[in-house]
Curated annotation (Swiss-Prot):
Catalyzes the formation of 6,7-dimethyl-8-ribityllumazine by condensation of 5-amino-6-(D-ribitylamino)uracil with 3,4-dihydroxy-2-butanone 4-phosphate. This is the penultimate step in the biosynthesis of riboflavin. 5-amino-6-(D-ribitylamino)uracil binds at residues 22, 57-59, 81-83, 114. This is 6,7-dimethyl-8-ribityllumazine synthase. The keyword Transferase applies. The keyword Ribonucleoprotein does not apply. GO terms for biological process: riboflavin biosynthetic process. It comes from Sodalis glossinidius (strain morsitans). One of its GO terms (molecular function) is 6,7-dimethyl-8-ribityllumazine synthase activity.
């Protein structure tokens, strides 16, 4: 039986991080976690990391699509936070963001790591951005690196 698994050390990986400005006080922590994981655990060089800011989570799929189409990156990490409010806006933004990012990954055959928090409250978002529940930005970055290696192994 053949088993394909990836490792997270990828010193030559070229990684883009697309991040939403909306809810920046939470997203900044996601970004810090992602960059730290890429550099410290993944051993990715600073010059191989590109950060692209967009207005909100809804705009992430378009930016990630452009990054994928550029062929300049081995993976893209999408970071943002969508917090439920009193209207249906949450469902629309979270759903379109998630399905849009998934569609880009499948179309471009490029790892697109989902680091977009979809929470019921600000407190839950803060917990997932580096306090009680770890840092989902770091987790997404490591997922991207592992998927780079998995796809390389599949193609080998």
């Amino acid at each position: 039986m053949n088993v394909i698994e990836g490792v997270v050390a990828a010193p030559d990986a070229r990684v883009a991080i697309a991040i939403a400005r909306f809810n920046h006080f939470i997203n900044d922590s996601l970004l810090n976690g992602a960059v730290d994981a890429l550099k410290r655990i993944g051993q990715v060089k600073d010059e191989n990391i590109t950060v692209v800011w967009v207005p909100g989570a809804y705009e992430l799929p378009l930016a990630v699509s452009a990054l994928a189409d550029s062929k300049n990156y081995d993976a893209v990490v999408a970071l943002g936070t969508v917090i439920r409010g009193g209207t249906a806006h949450f469902e629309f933004v979270a759903g379109e963001c998630s399905s849009g990012l998934s569609a880009v990954a499948a179309r471009a055959a490029l790892p697109v790591a989902f680091g977009v928090l979809t929470t019921e409250s600000i407190e839950q978002a803060i917990e997932r951005a580096g306090t009680k529940a770890g840092n989902k930005g770091a987790e997404a970055a490591l997922t991207a690196l592992e998927m780079i290696k998995v796809l390389q192994a599949i193609k080998a």
